[in-house]
Amino acid sequence: MAQVDLLNVKGEKVGTLEISDFVFNIDPNYDVMWRYVDMQLSNRRAGTASTKTRGEVSGGGRKPWPQKHTGRARHGSIRSPIWRHGGVVHGPKPRDWSKKLNKKMKKLALRSALSVKYRENKLLVLDDLKLERPKTKSLKEILQNLQLSDKKTLIVLPWKEEGYMNVKLSGRNLPDVKVIIADNPNNSKNGEKAVRIDGLNVFDMLKYDYLVLTRDMVSKIEEVLGNEAGKALTA
């Protein structure tokens, strides 16, 4: 199995953590990663852009001047696309831009992105990362200890509780830092708890240079992505 150094918030090595090769050390599939990012960005589009054609703009029923004997170019409507305030040719109309990707491809894309970070030595795992209260200075000091103060950093934390939420609030004023909180366990249809990693996504992992996880988050990721069947996954 692959191994990573386990660090504390002071940047000190406190141990070694074995991580799944199936999740963190596969040959990245860049095609599937692109498909995932394309799906993400497409699903963000509102699809509300709308223009009017020459048949929808107001006016234009009367011919502006006679066809002949004026010395001017012939025109049939003031709402022609070549006129100012005329209709728009082939303009956008409201549409649904959303795309879908099957669960296996989503998982493969996430494993590929995680493997890219691991192989580039840009994956850091902490024993834990909590703050007693939201304070940007405290998080900034932790990033300095990890030698990430001037790096674009994505921090992914396992669930919503006060200590983790304080980290998320502390990161709002740091322009190169994004903190993602994975959702709480949700009830599945059969009544069992489903572990979810909804916040983890390929786009953010590729956008930010370094990925910071906690030990609990690694376990959660391996539980969801460590096998091809069963676990809940949304994006």
UniProtKB/Swiss-Prot annotation:
Coiled coil: none annotated. One of its GO terms (cellular component) is ribosome. Pfam families: Ribosomal_L4. Residues 45-75 are annotated as: Disordered. GO terms for molecular function: DNA binding; rRNA binding; structural constituent of ribosome. Residues 65-75 have a biased composition (Basic residues). One of its GO terms (biological process) is translation. Signal peptide: none annotated. Transmembrane segments: none annotated. Gene3D superfamilies: 3.40.1370.10. InterPro entries: Ribosomal_uL4, Ribosomal_uL4-like, Ribosomal_uL4_dom_sf. Keywords: Ribonucleoprotein, Ribosomal protein, RNA-binding, rRNA-binding. Part of the 50S ribosomal subunit. A protein containing 11 mutations, chosen as amino acids which probably interact with nucleic acids (K140A, E141Q, Q144K, Q147A, S149E, K151delta, K152delta, I155M, P158G, W159E and K160L), gained the ability to regulate the E.coli S10 operon, suggesting it is now able to mediate contacts of L4 with the S10 mRNA leader in E.coli. This mutant protein did not associate any better with E.coli ribosomes however, indicating a separation of residues interacting with rRNA and mRNA. One of the primary rRNA binding proteins, this protein initially binds near the 5'-end of the 23S rRNA. It is important during the early stages of 50S assembly. It makes multiple contacts with different domains of the 23S rRNA in the assembled 50S subunit and ribosome. This protein only weakly controls expression of the E.coli S10 operon. It is incorporated into E.coli ribosomes, however it is not as firmly associated as the endogenous protein. The structure indicates that the N-terminal domain may bind to the 23S rRNA, while the C-terminal domain may bind to the mRNA, which could then be implicated in transcriptional and translational control of the S10 operon. However, it is not known if the S10 operon is controlled in this fashion in this organism. Belongs to the universal ribosomal protein uL4 family. This is Large ribosomal subunit protein uL4.
